[in-house]
Amino acid sequence: MAFDPAANAGPPLDEIQWHTPPQFEAGIHSNSILYYFAQSPFYDKTSNNEVVFQQGLNNQAMSQYLATRELFESRLKEMSGLEFIVAQEPAETGPGMGTGVWVINKQTRRKRPPTNPARPEDGPPDEIIVHSVYFVVGENIYMAPTLADVLSSRIGAIATAITKTIPLVDEVSDWAPAVGRRYITPAQPSAGAGAASGTTNYTASRTATPLPDGLPSTATTNKPGAKAGGGTTTNDPLLDSLLMEEALLTHERYGTEYMDENPITGKPGDFHLTSTGRKTQTKSALTLKEAAAALPALNTKGLGAAGSNPLAKGAAAAAAANANAVTGKETKSPKTPGGGGPPKPKRRKSKNVITTPGAA
């Protein structure tokens, strides 16, 4: 059977914790941290670290680079390629005390051509590409997760929590045409007799829904232990059917009536606008129509002559009034014989004699 690397690769590197008893003097310190990391599965033997290590073991002139970490890393910085280098040392929290956390970067170094060949040290800095980060805590080595892995894990946890809450919300909510939205209070295990009786607690919606006449309100039917007719109220399919029928009848009868921004009180068929005091004129309009239909018809047959037709007399009087208004003449009312007082005597005009003084 052929060897399958994918099947024998084991768990992902960012999900394992590796440690081994250190085989160095004084344990893990600045000069032995890279050698200790080289024993872990995170290490890559094709890196420049392995090249410098093998050269120091087999070449006497290169063995000096294995003495300290500073010399070892200085040799790595002169080369191009993949390398493991200490990015952060343990922070000092006190005299001779550190956190014990080492940060190691797996990176690729690329050399840039110097601008002045005579002084290559003054050239541009090397190009560094970091592939992964590892941290050593005590004797344990971990691989730091990437930002994409952290976000994916958090989003997955949030989605799982939301998926679990949706069925719970569906279980505690209930809706009926007459009473609206209701929420069931989950029964507590230590509720005692209330939980043992099997009654269900409901929390009604904030907006009260008007109920048909003869039906109990939501405040009394939804409370545990509330009695209607001498017993505890429960969900009744027959009552639900009756409420549904009442709702449909109310909609068919008063479905054309709408509510506006003004607060409306009353019941279907008799709404009142509380802000202005106005009322719907539906009933008054119907009353006027019925009164107009109940008036008797006026019989005008046989009233052809003006003397016997009161309507003709009225028309003649109106025509005479209009004629007087046009000509400016007024019609004098006839004198009633014997109805007035004695006739006034006529006033005679006196003639005044004007005398002219004669000449002296």
Curated annotation (Swiss-Prot):
GO cellular component: core mediator complex; mediator complex
Recorded superkingdom: Eukaryota
Feature: compositional bias, Low complexity: 190-205, 316-325
GO biological process terms on file: regulation of transcription by RNA polymerase II
Keywords per UniProt: Activator, Nucleus, Transcription, Transcription regulation
Description of how the protein assembles with itself and partners: Component of the Mediator complex.
Family: Belongs to the Mediator complex subunit 6 family.
Its job: Component of the Mediator complex, a coactivator involved in the regulated transcription of nearly all RNA polymerase II-dependent genes. Mediator functions as a bridge to convey information from gene-specific regulatory proteins to the basal RNA polymerase II transcription machinery. Mediator is recruited to promoters by direct interactions with regulatory proteins and serves as a scaffold for the assembly of a functional preinitiation complex with RNA polymerase II and the general transcription factors.
Name of this chain's protein: Mediator of RNA polymerase II transcription subunit 6
Gene name of the encoded protein: med-6
